[in-house]
Amino acid sequence: MRPLAEALNARGWTVRGLLLPGFGSDLDTLPFRRAEDWTRSVRNALVELRPQHGPVMLVGISMGAALSLRAVSQIPIDGLAMLAPFWRLPTVAWPMLPLLRRIFPILRPFRWMKLNFRDLQVRKVFQRFFPRIDPDDPQTPNEMRKFKLPIGMFDEIRRAGTAAYQAAAKVHIPLLTVQGTQDGVAQPRMTRQLLRNYAGPVRYAEVLAGHDLLDAMQPVWEQVRSLVLDFASRLEPVPIRIT
């Protein structure tokens, strides 16, 4: 999110980045986190910002977009930008996760994968989620194959997405959604399904890209940047209602 944060700050926005519980240096706690922990973190940040700043815009990418949608249904702000919003996978297994977490509690996601850490994209992805690994250590691929994740964590992601879909019908603030046409994670048809449930005004833009829309080295970056900055420039602060 840093390139976008810097672009917004250069336009005069006060920017606050948010690291969700269980990510970054807190990764060891990820298996024990729940969807409510992530949503509460976003909501608390909005509670702090809303009295001091206006307009207030929330920007979320991937699962963060779904969490943002849920949060703004509870805390009124002025605008929401969702980039590559991930809220569910169109697979048979997805709605079965509550059952699967009881039958197969542990998953080794990289057990059968060929992990080539000489590939810059592979290094980039793994270092984003596992900042403490050494990609140059020849033992790292073997260690990653032993890495275990509880199925329950994926079920919490499912719960967060379901909550976002249900919240969409209650949100009326302006919304920008940027979707990669080649995104295999947050698939375009799933994003369009989510937006059909949204109650407020929607600006929807598809770009020729995959899931990572914030890589400043990719050709699509300038387009994404321009879309968000233009959307932000049109927002007007909504008066805070004191009850």
What kind of feature is each model-predicted range?
Residues 209-223:
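Catalytic histidine-centered segment of alpha/beta-hydrolase-like enzymes
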Residues 1-26:
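Short, surface-exposed "cap/lid" segments of acyl-processing enzymes
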Residues 63-147:
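Alpha/beta-hydrolase-fold enzymes
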